[in-house]
């Protein structure tokens, strides 16, 4: 009777040893980047599981050349620079396949993206990593590129009704809900709160607002949510909006800065002498926030983990292009909440230039 047991592969070895697929691949093929002890463990486990290399598949993969473009905004750099770094890190760790990675930039969400796509797609890429701003404007772009044979991977947000092959982002609804709960715990008396957003036609930004509003209504009915302010990721617009809001009659006592475009708002508060008089929850982590969190001027920041988002988006896209995983990945990372008490666990990861507010 024939035995139909599945032959062990690299993934099985990696799972058994709790190491990465890349580590196993390097150890099996005697490539640099793996210490001798790990290499020995990999070879022992390969022998134990009865691993046999698939020569035909290996030959096809080694001869495969994949071209990928990352088309992303330049601003807000506190988010997009580490996102690009995550993509670059994953590309450098790719083994067994030739990957050509190009970066294309445009100024900010909903400004210059169509031109950037037109320029990038004059070259035919196997895959594109991108952040969909206005979902309605992006749907025809995604459809056109998909029909041309390009696999489209969303990162940082999503366009769920499009032909994209998958998406990687932080759970936006939960991020907004956490921010509302934090303010609700701090603000026990009747007061106004406000949300600074970027572009509500972007799913990520809209979901944060929904999560914030629904949680606030449930947990803090004594807090009134003022109309949302959209800066369209323009620092000057956010600064002017903050000045006008905080000098108005219905001045809020709590703020949720739901994108990384927080510096201009914080600067406006500092100039008005209100930075220590308002409860603030920000988004992401960059040098300018660190002293404010340390001094208690910011309650907490919701870290969207952009490096991890970029890394996973690249890895999932490559796996799809190589035929290793044809499932459409829908990955929502748990946001990390950074307080003064756990700031030291995250501050070493910050690499952006210092841009002090105070």
What is the meaning of each model-derived region?
Residues 1-63, 357:
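N-terminal helix-turn-helix DNA-binding module of bacterial transcription factors
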Residues 73-79, 102-113, 134, 168-178, ...:
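Hinge/beta->alpha junction and helix N-cap segments in small-molecule ligand-binding domains
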Residues 134-174, 286-294:
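Flexible loop/hinge segments that line or gate small-molecule binding clefts
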Residues 177-193:
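A conserved helix-loop-strand patch within extracytoplasmic ligand-binding domains
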Residues 53-115:
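Amphipathic helical "hinge" segments at domain boundaries
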Residues 216, 305-358:
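Hinge/cleft segment of the Venus flytrap/periplasmic-binding protein
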Residues 67, 149-153, 166, 192, ...:
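Proline-centered loop/turn at the N-terminus of a beta-strand
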Residues 128, 132-146, 212, 227-289:
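Hydrophobic alpha-helical
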């Amino acid at each position: 009777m024939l035995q139909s047991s599945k032959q062990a592969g690299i993934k099985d070895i990696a799972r058994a040893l709790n190491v990465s697929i890349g580590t196993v691949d390097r150890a099996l093929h005697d490539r640099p980047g793996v210490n001798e002890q790990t290499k020995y463990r990999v070879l022992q486990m390969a022998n134990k599981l009865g691993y046999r290399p698939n020569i035909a598949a290996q030959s096809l993969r080694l001869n495969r050349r994949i071209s990928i473009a990352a088309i992303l905004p330049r601003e807000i750099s506190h988010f997009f620079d580490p996102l690009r770094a995550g993509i670059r890190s994953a590309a450098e760790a790719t083994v067994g396949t030739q990957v050509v990675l190009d970066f294309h930039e445009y100024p900010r969400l909903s400004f210059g993206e169509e031109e950037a796509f037109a320029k990038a797609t004059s070259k035919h890429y196997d895959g594109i990593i991108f952040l969909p701003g206005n979902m309605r404007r992006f749907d025809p772009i995604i459809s056109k590129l998909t029909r041309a044979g390009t696999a489209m991977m969303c990162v940082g947000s999503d366009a769920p009704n499009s032909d994209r092959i998958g998406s990687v982002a932080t759970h936006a609804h939960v991020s907004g809900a956490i921010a509302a709960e934090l303010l609700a715990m701090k603000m026990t008396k009747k007061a106004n709160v406000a949300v600074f957003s970027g572009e509500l036609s972007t799913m990520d930004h809209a979901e944060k607002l929904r999560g914030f509003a629904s949680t606030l209504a449930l947990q803090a009915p004594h807090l009134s949510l003022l109309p949302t302010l959209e800066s369209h990721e323009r620092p000057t617009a956010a600064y002017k909006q903050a000045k006008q809001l905080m000098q108005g009659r219905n001045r809020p006592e709590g703020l949720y800065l739901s994108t990384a475009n927080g510096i201009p708002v914080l600067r406006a508060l500092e100039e008005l002498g209100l930075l220590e008089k308002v409860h603030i929850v920000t988004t992401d982590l960059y040098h300018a926030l660190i002293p404010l969190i340390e001094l208690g001027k910011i309650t907490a920041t919701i870290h969207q983990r952009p490096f991890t988002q970029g890394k996973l988006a690249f890895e999932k896209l490559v796996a799809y292009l190589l035929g290793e995983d044809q499932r459409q990945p829908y990955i929502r990372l748990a946001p990390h909440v950074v307080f003064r008490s756990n700031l030291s666990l995250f501050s070493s990861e910050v690499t952006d230039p210092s841009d002090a507010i105070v």
